[in-house]
Amino acid sequence: STTSKFQLFSLATNVAQINVGYFNMCVLSANATLICKPQFTGCPGLTSISLTDVRSKFLINEVHPWMIVFSFCVCGVSFLMGVVSSLPLIGRLEFLRNIRISLSFFSFFSILVTALFAHVAVSSFVMAVGNGTQNRVTASLGKKAMIFLWCSMGLVTLTGITDSIILLVTSRTKKIRKTILEKSKVLTPSSSFSSKSSTTKY
Amino acid sequence: MERGTSKFSWIGLVARIYNYIPHPSIFSNAILGIAWLFLIFLCCSCLTKSSIFARLLRVKNETTTVDVGFFGVCDQAINSTSRVCHELRNWDQTTGGLAYETSRFAWLQVHPVLLAIVVVFSTLSIVLTILKYLAPAYIRQWSISCLTTSTAACLLLALQMALAHISANSYAVGMNLTGKATAKFGVAAAVFGWISSGFFLLFSLIHLGLWTIERNKQKLFEETSLSFSFITTKLRLIETQYFICKDY
């Protein structure tokens, strides 16, 4: 029953309420009966909108549920790379860090596109269905799912920014060390020159 | 052997492509003009009767046909041949439910304010291009500003076209599924928008090539200055040694 609370949008009639998610639909009847299925062929209270068409024409073509699976995979791989990088000896490798930062940026971009698609498409669809003045169907946006999507994008953004800052600080530290080493090398000819001049004076 | 092992860089490739363009200044100005014209035509869609070709959405009812653009909406009854066009925010609620509803959708979901921001950036880019000819002493600053404004216009226009595409398609699907009306997405608006965005990108790339060549000239000048300063330092060293010998 928890899956019915995080819907993309919901369609409400006098008799029942249909919560539509990415891969699941839940029908809440008037007598408090909850039925969840991947796809409904018909609903007793809903006659003007076909749920099959809602899934095939709107969800698959406009919301693109494969994108959230893709984002999940990219974030999973990025997380695994982070776990691998935290191991004692493997974490020193340079290319692993570069791969992780590229994956972090890529996961940010994929979640951004996923959230934009979901929010814009569902908002427009809800506005098109309307508030039930003509065909007695009221559509409303699932705000919890949208909040979860944007919060996850914010967290991934925070992770990417943190990784970038750590990489910048580490590379800057390396440059400072190289500069100090070069200065210590450059000081040697000066001392030899001073010793040479003292020899000449004597 | 050292010449053959030079590193590949994208900016070097852009500069090399820039060298092959005949008359790059005239070419880039033409590209900017075309992008700006397409953008203005996109903004004026559905503001007059003759510009409904670049509409974003067409919604048909049993009684009316409504064409929605970015800033305008046109309404035509089925039994009449005349068409009434208005701006989005000026449409009265009492005259027609479908026209008001689609106008509200275009204002709240497509966000045409973003397109207005793109127009501001592109006009600023044109003003900076004109300033390159009026005040050529600061041509480097004008070129860098042109690069910045046209890149911003390209990105914002791409974002606007993505928003318009997703929201108009979803609205059309919603209208078709509920049976209120038959809605169809306007392909010409998408074509105009993406062409304009692509041309702004081309203009940005050409100015990136120009900027790269200017930076290469500046680097060459700095290297020459370093060479002369090295010779000057050597002369001072010789003079110091001669002074020491003379004193002894």
Swiss-Prot record, chain B:
GO terms of biological process kind: plasma membrane fusion involved in cytogamy
Membrane-related topology note: Multi-pass membrane protein
Keyword Cell wall biogenesis/degradation assigned: no
Keyword RNA-binding belongs to the record: no
Inducers of expression: Expressed during meiosis and in response to nitrogen deprivation.
Subcellular location: Membrane
Keywords, in A-Z order: Membrane, Transmembrane, Transmembrane helix
Transmembrane parts of this sequence: 26-46, 110-130, 144-164, 186-206
One Gene Ontology cellular component annotation held by this UniProt entry: mating projection tip membrane
Location (main, coarse): membrane
Stretch forming the signal peptide: none
Protein family (similarity comment): Belongs to the SUR7 family.
Record protein name field: Delayed minus-nitrogen induction protein 2
The species this protein was found in: Schizosaccharomyces pombe (strain 972 / ATCC 24843)
Gene: dni2
